[in-house]
């Protein structure tokens, strides 16, 4: 179904079965597949390809040569009906690629809302990107990566499959991330190592001074105390009982499968 207010350029191809909401704009030479749903106010600039079982929310801007919902690069993939879901108000810049999921990984690649994916960023199969994240130019997420809210991934940075990047993390450019990055941490290098707490980012997002001090204390327990990882986790859990901001660390430890960067 195509809303009567949607615009489709004469050179674009929108296949039968696609759903376009109100005021959707499909620019020149775009291709929209038959199982695609695009929400109200979303704009495809030009030469954008949206394929597969892909659902895109409202008021997104998708720039030229982006490819969304295409077959993933997992050699085990055999054409199963897997999906891509994208939220609202994202800016997806030129040549970004977002691949559909795999059955083995849950069948869904998901991008939240209010994100900026810069030129040539790649989101592989079964990744989850939260809200208000930034993937800078040429940032690359391997399969099954999870990026939590407000994280920033620097340009030319590659993230290993199954890694978790915690909320409010900043990963510097040209880095290689092979383990999980705890929330609030600045990481840099190949392999990425911790360089402190993202204090400026936390201030900009309204964290209190007391909360930031508690986060820094948790960071010190994890990285500066000389304690074993298990002992540091126990003390951080005690700290989290008094400071809710620190609970993000304990939740991260429960999810982590590759272990925190060291």
From Swiss-Prot:
Any GO CC annotation of this UniProt entry: membrane
EC class name: transferase
Native species: Salmonella arizonae (strain ATCC BAA-731 / CDC346-86 / RSK2980)
Oligomer status and interactors: Homotrimer.
Any single GO BP term: lipid A biosynthetic process
Reaction(s) the record says it catalyses: a (3R)-hydroxyacyl-[ACP] + UDP-N-acetyl-alpha-D-glucosamine = a UDP-3-O-[(3R)-3-hydroxyacyl]-N-acetyl-alpha-D-glucosamine + holo-[ACP]
Subcellular location, record wording: Cytoplasm
EC numbers, comma separated: 2.3.1.129
Molecular-function GO terms, alphabetical: acyl-[acyl-carrier-protein]-UDP-N-acetylglucosamine O-acyltransferase activity
PANTHER family, per database record: ACYL-[ACYL-CARRIER-PROTEIN]--UDP-N-ACETYLGLUCOSAMINE O-ACYLTRANSFERASE, ACYL-[ACYL-CARRIER-PROTEIN]--UDP-N-ACETYLGLUCOSAMINE O-ACYLTRANSFERASE, MITOCHONDRIAL-RELATED
Family note: Belongs to the transferase hexapeptide repeat family. LpxA subfamily.
Role this protein plays: Involved in the biosynthesis of lipid A, a phosphorylated glycolipid that anchors the lipopolysaccharide to the outer membrane of the cell.
InterPro entries in alphabetical order: Acetyltransf_C, Acetyltransf_C_sf, Hexapep, Hexapep_transf_CS, Lipid_A_LpxA, Trimer_LpxA-like_sf
Protein's pathway: Glycolipid biosynthesis; lipid IV(A) biosynthesis; lipid IV(A) from (3R)-3-hydroxytetradecanoyl-[acyl-carrier-protein] and UDP-N-acetyl-alpha-D-glucosamine: step 1/6
Protein name, as recorded: Acyl-[acyl-carrier-protein]--UDP-N-acetylglucosamine O-acyltransferase
The organism's place on the tree of life at top rank: Bacteria
Pfam name, any one: Hexapep
Keyword vocabulary terms for this entry: Acyltransferase, Cytoplasm, Lipid A biosynthesis, Lipid biosynthesis, Lipid metabolism, Repeat, Transferase
């Amino acid at each position: 179904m195509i809303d009567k207010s949607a615009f489709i350029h004469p050179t674009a191809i929108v296949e039968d079965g696609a759903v376009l909401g109100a005021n959707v704009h499909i620019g020149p030479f775009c291709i929209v597949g038959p199982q695609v749903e695009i929400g109200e106010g979303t704009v495809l600039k030009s030469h954008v390809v949206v394929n597969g079982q892909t659902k895109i929310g409202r008021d997104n801007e998708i720039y030229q040569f982006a490819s969304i919902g295409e077959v993933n690069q997992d050699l085990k993939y055999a054409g199963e009906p897997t999906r891509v879901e994208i939220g609202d108000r994202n800016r997806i810049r030129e040549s970004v690629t977002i691949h559909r999921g795999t059955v083995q990984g849950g069948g869904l690649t998901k991008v939240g809302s209010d994100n900026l994916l810069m030129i040539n960023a790649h989101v592989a199969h079964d990744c989850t990107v939260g809200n208000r994240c930034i993937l800078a130019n040429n940032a690359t997420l391997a399969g099954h990566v999870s990026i939590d809210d407000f994280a920033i991934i620097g340009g030319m940075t590659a993230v290993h499959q199954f890694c978790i990047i915690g909320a409010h993390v900043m990963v510097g450019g040209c880095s290689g991330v092979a383990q999980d990055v705890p929330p609030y941490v600045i990481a840099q290098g190949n392999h990425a190592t911790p360089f402190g707490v993202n204090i400026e980012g936390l201030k900009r997002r309204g964290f209190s001074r007391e909360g930031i001090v508690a986060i820094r204390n948790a960071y010190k327990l994890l990285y500066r105390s000389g304690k074993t990882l298990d002992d540091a986790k126990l003390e951080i859990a005690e700290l989290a009982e008094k400071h809710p901001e620190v609970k993000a660390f304990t939740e991260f430890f429960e999810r982590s499968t590759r272990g925190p960067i060291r």
